[in-house]
Amino acid sequence: MIIYRDLISHDEMFSDIYKIREIADGLCLEVEGKMVSRTEGNIDDSLIGGNASAEGPEGEGTESTVITGVDIVMNHHLQETSFTKEAYKKYIKDYMKSIKGKLEEQRPERVKPFMTGAAEQIKHILANFKNYQFFIGENMNPDGMVALLDYREDGVTPYMIFFKDGLEMEKC
């Protein structure tokens, strides 16, 4: 399995269990997710071992809640954040500088294509700004990557967009 981590915060962003495709001439990765519901707080009797107690009513004392969300967000503990268009412009400008610096150190051949492609992609993001929800890694590092969540035309299928050059891959 491959884990994709944020190059700056080192937070886990997603893994290769999802359908991943390159978009924007290889500048970004689009990761398709699913809406899922999970029950939290419910303890399965098979995990406890032994027999269920005969002393009290069945299920007493266990409260469970059902949480519904996008599997990528829930599995990798991504945290939702919000931006005004102006705040996002400021963030993305600083983020691009950070990634450019990392690329200059590690992969100088990627600097020019990244900077050229990023400008186009940012125009596209800003043009569709109201469609997106924004997510950052578990540690909520404000300098790290902000992933974008949108839904396909069907209104049901969620997908997330990540800048490919802002990710590092870790084989597990």
Curated annotation (Swiss-Prot):
Which keywords annotate this record? Calcium, Cytoplasm, Phosphoprotein
Q: Where is this region: Required for reduction of TSC22D1 protein stability?
A: 70-172
User: What does UniProt note about where in the body, tissue by tissue, this protein is expressed?
Assistant: Found in several healthy and tumoral cells including erythrocytes, hepatocytes, macrophages, platelets, keratinocytes, erythroleukemia cells, gliomas, melanomas, hepatoblastomas, and lymphomas. It cannot be detected in kidney and renal cell carcinoma (RCC). Expressed in placenta and prostate.
**Family matches, as Pfam families:** TCTP
Gene Ontology molecular function: any one: DNA-binding transcription factor binding
Against Gene3D superfamilies, the record matches this protein to: Metal Binding Protein, Guanine Nucleotide Exchange Factor, Chain A (2.170.150.10)
The entry's protein name is: Translationally-controlled tumor protein
Which organism is this protein's natural source? Homo sapiens (Human)
Report the gene name. Answer: TPT1
